[in-house]
């Protein structure tokens, strides 16, 4: 069956269609070819894609309008009552998200572990098909790793009405997957966030899966992880961490727009790192290494922004930021804790467990293709199974949507148990 829908029209239904929502795209038509069962191919006859359409840069006003309050649901005591990683603390059904009627949402708070080994509470949301029976074995799971949002509690995607990527994630729910979207520790919950730290975020992703299964028993045991930007680094870090865990249910990782380390991501942010991003980076380093002295990195002028970082999200920005050049002290990158932080976030040092699909756009200013190639070369050299899909003339905002067909095909192949394809040099 093929639907032709004018772009800008939201389709909401609890009927038979596996697509209950389509993203708001500008111009042209969206043609969705659907087959009975799991298989679906999406053909987009427009140049604008999911990432651009659903997360426009509308500034502080837009972020405020989409924000949800931080409720007592997210509050946890310090220290936490003892719990194993992945153990569910609490859950609640939540109906205030801007999601299609075909999607049910359940918020979760669960035990995870910080970089220092501390038991930390982490929040997230589980999205499942509404009113449908799961297949035998339960809903196949896509663990979603989100991109950079900031370090404030309010920057948690589960505290945004569109869950950060609502139309994109809803598409997968309507294809028959459950989506488990962690916030990362410290976003939502009252702990420090390890900004841009792949190993910490990967731990939160891995622990979100059993917690989600405890909250929503219809979830199956098999899962993949997919992430974009900071979440791409996280998805690859999950693959590396799984080398030591070897969860038989884990089937692979998709890294979109960021198959590289924290140092390269911050250095190659569009038009250079923003002042707030540098403040957030210092915050993340301090979270991973508590003995790190922020004043060894940041100037006196930057400290006010650093202390305000817990109140500001990257999207909303700050009214009076010092320039990036005024933020940092000369030679800050040679600080021992900064170097250790960047080194622990350098991909391709630990062999990945399971296949990786890397997706990037050659026009990506934030994640330079040559740096991605260097990371993939390291990973391939150590025997990782990497499939790299490059899209000419696409930037991060469009590559996440324009690569949907490849994403779906790769995910279907993993759950079907078909062999992986690699194109390592």
Feature locations, PLM:
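Catalytic-loop region of hydrolases
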Residues: 51-133
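Accessory cap/linker subdomain of secreted extracellular hydrolases
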Residues: 58-71, 78, 256-349
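Short beta-strand element of the alpha/beta-hydrolase
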Residues: 137-147
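Conserved alpha/beta-hydrolase
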Residues: 146, 169-188
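Alpha/beta-hydrolase active-site loop
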Residues: 195-215
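Primarily recognizes the serine-hydrolase "nucleophile elbow" in alpha/beta-hydrolase
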Residues: 211-216, 220-275
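C-terminal catalytic histidine-bearing segment of alpha/beta-hydrolase fold enzymes
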Residues: 340, 366, 373-425
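Short beta-strand/loop motif that positions the catalytic acidic residue
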Residues: 358-360, 364
């Amino acid at each position: 069956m093929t639907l032709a829908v004018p772009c800008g029209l939201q389709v909401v239904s609890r009927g038979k269609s596996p697509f209950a929502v389509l993203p708001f795209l500008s111009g042209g038509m969206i043609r969705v070819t659907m087959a009975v069962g799991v298989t679906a191919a999406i053909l987009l006859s427009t140049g604008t894609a999911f990432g651009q359409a659903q997360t426009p840069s509308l500034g502080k006003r837009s972020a405020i309008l989409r924000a949800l309050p931080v409720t007592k649901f997210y509050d946890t005591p310090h220290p936490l009552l003892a719990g194993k990683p992945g153990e569910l603390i609490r859950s609640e059904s939540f109906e205030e998200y801007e999601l299609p009627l075909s999607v049910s949402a359940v918020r979760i708070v669960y035990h995870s572990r910080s970089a220092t080994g501390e038991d930390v509470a982490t929040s997230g949301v589980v999205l499942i098909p509404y009113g449908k029976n799961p297949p035998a074995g339960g809903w196949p799971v896509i663990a979603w790793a989100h991109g950079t949002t900031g370090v404030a509690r309010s920057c948690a995607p589960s505290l945004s009405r569109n869950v950060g990527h609502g139309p994109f994630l809803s598409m997968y729910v309507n294809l028959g997957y459950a989506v488990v979207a962690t916030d990362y520790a410290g976003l939502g919950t009252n702990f420090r966030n390890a900004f841009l730290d792949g190993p910490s975020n990967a731990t939160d992703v891995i622990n979100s899966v059993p917690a989600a299964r405890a909250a929503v028993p219809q979830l199956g045991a098999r899962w993949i992880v997919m992430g974009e930007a900071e979440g791409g680094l996280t998805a690859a870090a999950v693959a590396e961490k799984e080398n030591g865990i070897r969860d038989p249910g884990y089937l692979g990782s998709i890294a979109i727009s960021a198959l590289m380390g924290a140092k390269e991501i911050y250095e190659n942010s569009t038009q250079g790192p923003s002042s707030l991003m540098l403040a957030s980076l210092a915050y993340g380093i301090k979270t991973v290494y508590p003995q790190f002295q922020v004043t060894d990195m940041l100037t006196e002028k930057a400290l006010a922004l650093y202390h305000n970082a817990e109140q500001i999200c990257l999207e909303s920005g700050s009214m009076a930021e010092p320039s990036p050049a005024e933020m940092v002290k000369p030679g800050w990158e040679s600080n021992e804790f900064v170097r250790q932080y960047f080194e622990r976030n350098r991909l391709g040092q630990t062999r990945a467990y399971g296949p990786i699909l890397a997706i990037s756009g050659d026009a990506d200013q934030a994640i330079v293709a040559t740096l991605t190639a260097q990371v993939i070369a390291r990973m391939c050299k150590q025997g990782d199974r990497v499939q790299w899909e490059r899209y000419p003339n696409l930037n991060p905002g469009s590559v996440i949507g324009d690569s949907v067909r490849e994403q779906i095909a790769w995910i279907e192949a993993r759950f079907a148990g078909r062999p992986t394809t690699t194109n390592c040099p």
